[in-house]
């Protein structure tokens, strides 16, 4: 049976890159999002590529809607990304819990009900499951963190949901924890600053990144590749892995932008992020694009759209 993919949250940064990756592999792709703003898809895909994508407007808090999409498109693989990020989950905690926790539970339940057809499930957890006090935990991908944001609590709960579906129902999955993802389409969330700075530099505008921590930076197409590979992996259990990247201070990020856009007016606030600087990786093989190359490619795409 040929592959047919459902990607929830596909209109976001990582989701758009996943859709592009799959389309370029000549795979059938259906997106499932509550909104209809496909600007991130249009930013990174050619019109002919986008015509091959089926866009479905739906809400992950509806088990019926999810089941309908899975059946209508005979889905064989699922990547679940749909979520309210830190600022939105903080602004409306009940809605954040509904989307992030109940929505994810619905994904697992819908896939369980169709396990004879659906061969792979990957979902997004987050480095937000950790706190700065979790430096030791961050050295072990299977360690339990102590999140200090509602979003992080939601993601930690989802990792538990995945384990329970494995233990009680034998439903396999792989969770991946992104940290600082950058690249075209990354324009929302607490850590979008580096990409917003690249876009500002191309426009000739000044920009101040709102934090300064030494952090691990992952290029969005690398994260996309990791999710696709995870959904295809013939795994057993419910493992969770940290997505790798290049760990550098913010000064190196700014320098990489300035190298591509001489005269760029980029600075950053001396504010740390509430997460460890880097994390254990290696449990699941994933690509890592050097930061300088990722910034170069991102700036080039922004320049091509000016």
PLM regions: where:
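Short alpha-helical oligomerization interface
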Residues: 87-103, 139-147
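Glycine/proline-rich active-site loop of Rossmann-fold NAD(P)-dependent oxidoreductases
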Residues: 156, 169, 182-195, 220-221, ...
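Conserved Rossmann-fold NAD(P)-dependent oxidoreductase catalytic core, especially the SDR/UDP-sugar
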Residues: 105-150
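C-terminal substrate-binding subdomain of Rossmann-fold SDR/epimerase-dehydratase oxidoreductases
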Residues: 205, 209-306
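A conserved pocket-lining segment of Rossmann-fold NAD(P)-dependent short-chain dehydrogenase/reductase
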Residues: 89-90, 173-184, 196-218, 222
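Flexible, glycine-rich beta-alpha linker
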Residues: 130-131, 149, 174-192
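Active-site Tyr-X1-5-Lys
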Residues: 132-135, 146-174
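N-terminal Rossmann/SDR dinucleotide-binding element
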Residues: 1-77
